[in-house]
Design a protein with these regions (language model features):
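N-terminal alpha/beta PP-like core and its mobile active-site loop of ThDP/TPP-dependent enzymes
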Residues: 2-283
């Protein structure tokens, strides 16, 4: 990316914008707020393709020691964030520039949506001062992403950056997990505000956690059915892995000596050669 390109609508270059950032500890830019908020949510890596609308986020990530994985296509970045979330159980994060950067990532976000994967998609946008004026790569990202995310919104002020990231991250884990989209206009990212005017939620604050406990009587009845069955079999699906219940599931299968079939993300928790691993028969 050429950081010396003029910003949309004239004005300073991207490199000039960064050079003008205050060094005072009493103020902070929107991009640095993004990085601090991501750090508070446990994010240690972002997947992205470098773009002018989001450059200040990179500056903040460097200061917060958040790893930047710069790929060659935004679809790859979205799929990588999805894969990261599935393997770690933590929040995956993809950052894209405005317009085609956002739309290129849609297939990966749609995959995360159907797979119930907690992915936060942060997207750039033209400046608020140029809203509806045909600024560079301006698209209705929030409306486009709404059908394939659990939460889709735009940050309209720098002071709200951190708490809206916390809100979007919370939605990724509330109930059935899934992706959230947060659009942040360029001037919101570049603007500096007083640290005292910023709301910085505590790490994981208000993070909902729901677990299906089940009725004890039903669980006891199910156990009796399994023990008394003549030819039982168990089908294990994706939630066994996403809920990190695979160790208990394997212990159950082996303790009761019951064959198990695996679907979705549960495939692989037992190796194909295991005596309790049964292959499906398709016609």
């Amino acid at each position: 990316m050429n950081t010396n390109t003029k910003l949309a609508g004239g004005g300073d270059t991207a490199s000039d914008t960064l050079a003008q950032k205050s060094k005072s500890e009493g103020v902070i830019s929107g991009g640095h707020l993004v990085a601090k908020a991501l750090k508070a949510e446990g994010v240690d890596t972002i997947f992205t393709l470098c773009g002018g609308h989001i450059i200040d986020i990179y500056d903040g990530c460097l200061d917060e020691n958040i790893r930047i994985v710069d790929v060659r296509h935004e679809q790859v970045a979205a799929h990588a964030a999805d894969g990261y979330a599935r393997q770690t159980g933590r929040l995956g994060c993809v950052v894209t520039t405005a317009g085609p950067g956002c739309t290129n990532a849609m297939t990966g976000i749609a995959t995360a949506f159907r797979s119930e994967s907690p992915v936060l998609h942060i997207g750039g946008q033209g400046a608020l001062t140029q809203h509806k004026m045909g600024s560079l790569q301006d698209l209705p990202h929030v409306d486009i992403l709404a059908p394939i995310t659990k939460f889709s919104a735009s940050v309209r002020s720098t002071e709200r950056v951190a708490d809206m990231i916390a809100m979007a991250a919370r939605e990724c884990f509330a109930g059935a997990p899934g992706p959230s989209y947060l659009e942040i206009p360029r001037d919101v990212l570049d603007r500096e505000v007083k640290v005292d005017d910023v709301t910085m939620p505590a790490p994981g604050q208000y993070r909902g956690s729901t677990h299906s406990l089940g009725d004890p009587a039903d669980i006891e009845r199910l156990a009796q059915i399994l023990v008394q069955a003549e030819r039982p079999a168990i089908l294990l699906g994706s939630q066994v892995w996403s809920a990190r219940g695979h160790t208990e599931a394997i212990a159950l299968v082996r303790a009761l000596n019951i064959p198990a079939y695996f679907n979705g993300a549960a495939r692989g928790i037992l190796p194909p050669g295991d005596p309790h691993h049964f292959h499906r028969t398709r016609r």
